[in-house]
């Protein structure tokens, strides 16, 4: 389900070929990620050379996978998630939000995850398994 960035497929020596730095992502309205960032477009830092294979975007979508953030040119998945009725907090990102998080200003993804955990902290084991 992953593939190399198209621009790197023919490169045999990978040194210096990562996708590095800050990149914008357009967020899907109504998504968990959009509700956490409270913005239409966000910029996050990256450090990778792989991506979600575009050949699987439609198949993943048909099976409930939400592409909740995409590059401005519409080609790269930046954020993805499962619906909240399937999982209380299932978010993936190509970005590295830990690069910009600070003790007094955590990434919206981290603070959202902590909030999701705290909201379920009082549930019993059987309630957690049933939900």
PLM regions: where:
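Amide-donor transfer/coupling interface in amidating biosynthetic enzymes
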Residues: 1-131
